[in-house]
């Protein structure tokens, strides 16, 4: 957290899974407590792991204790291993997304002023006045990421920040997902968002997580190595917004071009890349 803030990063995120990681709520609150301006959020909370009214209370508390620095990332859930290990039914994508849509309504209702009631297929809330209320009224910025048409359309209508993801319908990251990370696939995903958002598109912050980062003077060799590892063509790695490969100067140019093409102004890199990527952050902050 200290490193991120000192090097100019604006937000620290972490996943919400049951594998080898810290629990996001206490970990992110610790990060907020030792920093001043760094924003915090999960990428993303899975709606199926907690009742949304319980999650809303935790998130509102985080926003209060961090003095309004929370980003509310939430999704329908996709990683099948989480569900299998915890004995949570891995329902069809339709059911999980339906439940997520209801969960988002519950979270917004719990954070809004006054009591609210809700009756859906998955959740029923009766005259509940959620407390505390978040500092960022009526709700912290909502981040929804998706790879398929339905979730991207929901994100376009409901989110402040829309994340463009690979398509994870298989429940794992594999060849099928890699095929949806091409520049052409991202063109199609952004078009879905633009059409579903309508007039509000210009108010949305577009987000992408760069999973493949290699800061090197030999961009071609690095891209070839990544392509070989993934079983894809080098050109795909060079053009995909999910990859950042090359020297600092090239990464700056690539990010500016991707902002122009897709609108990406919010780019996430992994913890291992924080130090090497810092000059790129310094060059682009405020631009």
Predicted regions and their residues:
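Active-site-adjacent structural elements that line small-molecule/cofactor binding pockets in enzymes
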Residues: 1-287
């Amino acid at each position: 957290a200290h490193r991120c803030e000192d090097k100019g990063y604006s937000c620290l995120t972490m996943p919400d899974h049951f594998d080898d990681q810290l629990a996001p709520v206490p970990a992110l609150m610790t990060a907020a407590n030792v920093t001043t301006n760094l924003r915090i959020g999960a990428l993303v909370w899975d709606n199926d792991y907690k009742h949304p009214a319980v999650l809303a209370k935790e998130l509102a508390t985080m926003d209060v204790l961090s003095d309004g620095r929370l980003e509310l990332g939430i999704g329908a859930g996709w990683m099948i291993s989480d569900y299998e290990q915890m004995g949570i039914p891995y329902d069809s994508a339709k059911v999980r997304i339906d439940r997520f849509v209801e969960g988002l309504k519950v979270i917004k209702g719990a954070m809004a002023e006054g009591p609210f009631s809700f009756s859906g297929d998955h959740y029923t809330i009766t005259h509940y006045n959620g407390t505390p209320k978040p500092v960022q009224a009526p709700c912290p910025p909502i981040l929804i990421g998706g790879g398929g048409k339905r979730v991207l359309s929901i994100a376009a209508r409901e989110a402040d920040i829309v994340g463009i993801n690979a398509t994870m319908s298989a429940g794992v990251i594999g060849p099928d997902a890699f095929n949806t990370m091409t520049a052409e696939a991202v063109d199609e995903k952004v078009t879905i968002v633009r059409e579903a958002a309508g007039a509000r598109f210009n108010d949305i912050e577009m987000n992408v997580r760069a999973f493949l980062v290699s800061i090197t003077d030999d961009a071609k060799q690095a891209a070839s190595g990544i392509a070989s590892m993934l079983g894809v063509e080098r050109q795909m790695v060079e053009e995909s917004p999910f990859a950042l490969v090359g020297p600092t100067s090239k990464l700056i140019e690539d990010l500016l071009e991707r902002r122009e093409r897709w609108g990406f102004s919010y780019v996430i890199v992994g913890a291992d890349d924080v130090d090497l990527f810092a000059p790129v952050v310094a060059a682009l902050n405020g631009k």
